[in-house]
Design a protein with these regions (language model features):
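C-terminal anion-handling pockets and recognition modules
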Residues: 111
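Cytosolic histidine kinase catalytic core of two-component systems
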Residues: 40, 105-106
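Short Lys/Arg-rich basic patches
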Residues: 22-30
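Conserved short secondary-structure transition element at the edge of the structured enzyme core
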Residues: 5, 33-100
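Short coil/turn segments at secondary-structure boundaries
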Residues: 124-129
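Eukaryotic N-terminal low-complexity, Ser/Thr- and Lys/Arg-rich leader segments
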Residues: 133-137
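Tryptophan-centric aromatic hotspots in well-structured domains and transmembrane helices
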Residues: 3-4, 68, 115-117, 121
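Aromatic-lined glycan-binding groove of carbohydrate-active enzymes
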Residues: 1-23, 60
């Protein structure tokens, strides 16, 4: 089960610098300092999404990201079940739509290549007690 399969929202293509500044992600190198550099992944997800239709609409970057994870599992002969967290029914439906996205080998290679250049640490760095509340008290 992949942890945070949509990169805390980054791979949805909806995360902005402003949203990062207002969240706990502001202290994370992958999201704040390297936002622009890591956008190449989102750009590629969007480009691949343009080649797929889900429920009569162009696929979303999130759907492609989830399909990419599942297909990586197939490559290694492992069952992969991404479980993205969400609080909105629309996102649950969107995420389920990823099952209709069947990526080609060429699309997988494109996504694999661009992901090799992601910058910044993936996990949170704990810098003291304030990381939990992000100074919201």
């Amino acid at each position: 089960v992949p942890y945070s399969p949509l990169g805390r929202g980054f791979l949805t293509g909806t995360l902005t610098k402003e949203k990062i500044q207002a969240s706990i992600l502001v202290d994370q190198p992958r999201y704040d300092q390297n936002f622009d550099a890591n956008q190449v992944v989102v750009v590629e997800l969007r480009a691949v999404a343009d080649n797929h239709v889900v429920d009569g609409h162009t696929a979303t970057p999130a759907q492609v990201a989830l399909a990419w994870l599942r297909k990586q599992g197939e490559h290694y002969g492992l069952p992969v079940v991404p479980i993205p967290g969400t609080s909105k029914i629309e996102r649950v439906q969107e995420n389920a739509g990823s099952l209709a996205v069947d990526l080609t080998d060429e699309e997988m290679q494109r996504l694999d290549e661009v992901s090799k250049n992601v910058q910044g640490e993936r996990n949170f760095t704990f810098t003291g007690p304030n990381w939990l509340s992000h100074h919201r008290e």
